[in-house]
UniProtKB/Swiss-Prot annotation:
Protein's recorded name: Probable protein E5
Keywords: Early protein
Similarity annotation: Belongs to the papillomaviridae E5 protein family.
Gene: E5
Length: 168
């Protein structure tokens, strides 16, 4: 039987609180962005299921990296939601990732959607549940920016030309 020392327990608690803090802050920012987006009136709503490329500054090259973004349908009336497909590329996570994630955050602020809904929640890990499949958030992943960046919502843009639309 492994007995946890007070130190272990203390460390675990500190880490847990730290994660909780990061998560709360991320969600808070997300809510603020979403509210700002709702105030923006966009004449034409983004069509459903249109692949959109989001430009993210690439720290290692002069070119911008195109992160594929997908506009998905949501049943609640006029609301649309954008989810970033797949993971943030590995090279964006290393080295100057801190700088990059700030840039990504700014880019996401710019990206505006017609009444955006927030879908930043923790995915429940269970294989036997029916219903829509929720993207899993693994425990090892630092729940903050990577998950938020991947999972979050993106807002639409006042200047639509910054978004390049792909062909279905």
């Amino acid at each position: 039987l492994h007995v946890q020392t007070a130190h272990h327990i203390k460390t675990a608690t500190t880490n847990r609180n730290q994660r909780k803090k990061v998560r709360t802050e991320a969600l808070q920012q997300v809510k603020e962005i979403a509210n700002a987006a709702k105030a923006i009136k966009v004449p034409t709503p983004v069509p459903v299921s249109v692949p959109v490329a989001l430009q993210v500054p690439n720290p290692h090259h002069l070119v911008h990296h195109q992160v594929p973004v997908h506009v998905g349908r949501q049943d609640s009336g006029p609301y649309k939601q954008i989810a970033i497909q797949g993971k943030v590329p590995k090279y964006l996570q290393k080295g100057r990732w801190k700088v990059t994630q700030a840039a990504i955050k700014v880019t996401l602020h710019l990206l505006l959607l017609h009444h955006t809904t927030v879908t930043a929640g923790t995915g429940r890990k269970s294989n036997n549940q029916r219903g829509p499949r929720v993207e899993r958030v693994t425990r090892r992943e630092p729940w903050g920016e990577i998950a938020a960046t991947r999972k979050v919502i993106l807002l639409l843009l006042p200047r639509p030309q910054t978004v390049t639309r792909g062909v279905c």
